[in-house]
Each structure stands twice: as C-alpha cells, then as structure tokens.
Amino acid sequence: MPTPPFERFYETHRDEIYRYLVRLLGRGGAEDAFQETFLRALRGYAGLRHAENLRAWAFTIATRVALDERRRERPAADLPELAARDRRPAYAELEHLAGELPRTERAAVVLRYGYDLAYADIASALGSTEDAARQAASSGVRRLRRKGIR
C-alpha cells in the first residue's frame, strides 16, 4: 500500500495524537511535544516504504517524544495530575484513572484501552518487547483494581 500524502496523514492522526500527548504530559507539555512529533514524522515520512500501520507509527513517535520530554522534566512525584480533557466520557475516565499510574504503565493502558492498539504496536511505541508491553498494561490494570477501580 503506497503512503498517502503527508497532509492527509497529518489530518487523519493529529487530533488523537494531540489527545494522547495531553494525557501523558498535560496541556502545556503536549503543545511542544505535538509539534516535535509531527516534525519527526515529516522528516521520516518520505523514507517509509509502505503505509500498513501509520497510526501505530505516529503513536510510536509521540510516545518517544513524550518520554524524552519527561526525562527533561521534574521527577515523577512532581508531575501534575491529569484532568479529564476529552469530551468522550469513557476516555475522560480512563485519562483520569491512568493519571495515577507510573509512566510506562500509563502509556500502555491508554494505548491499549483508550486507542485499542495491538500489543505489538504498543511495544513499538514504548521501545520494548510485546511481552513487556502486555505486562505493563496488565500491571497498570492490576494496580487500578487494587485501588478499587474496575
């Protein structure tokens, strides 16, 4: 499958990538990360050989940019709590609940249950193995259940 023009790729994925970055970084951090995500995507887009899973590729870039941003920020204990920003109630609730998880678990839970990505795609986004992605999502869900969240 040939890759669509970058403009179409951007139009198709920008909103959900922005929401994802807001979930991970808060609104202030998401602005710069969003720009950096699509700048990196633009740089690499011409080199793509096929367009089988551009969505997962975009999430991979966004996750790596978010992790880079987090490394430059304050320690995790000082991170602001995420607020419900998405208008869809299920996503808003997931965003709120996942905000209490460690970064990797939070990303895995949001990508799996918020965006319905396959574990292989989550692994690619996190820079880990599929088993590690599955474990991170599972640990996140277990941690939420221990807090009484079903």
Regions found by a protein language model. Name each.
Residues 46-50, 60-80, 87, 146:
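Arg/Lys-rich amphipathic alpha helix in sigma70-family domain 2
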Residues 108-112:
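A short pre-motif secondary-structure segment
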Residues 63, 67, 126-150:
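DNA-recognition helix of helix-turn-helix
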Residues 1-19, 106:
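A short, charge-rich alpha-helical start-of-domain segment used by transcription regulators
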Residues 17, 21, 30-41, 61, ...:
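Short, small-hydrophobic-rich alpha-helical interface motif
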Residues 14, 35-42, 52-72, 141:
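Σ70-family region 2.3-2.4 aromatic/basic alpha-helix that recognizes the −10 promoter
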Residues 1-4, 8, 72-99:
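Acidic, proline/glycine-rich intrinsically disordered inter-domain spacer in sigma factors
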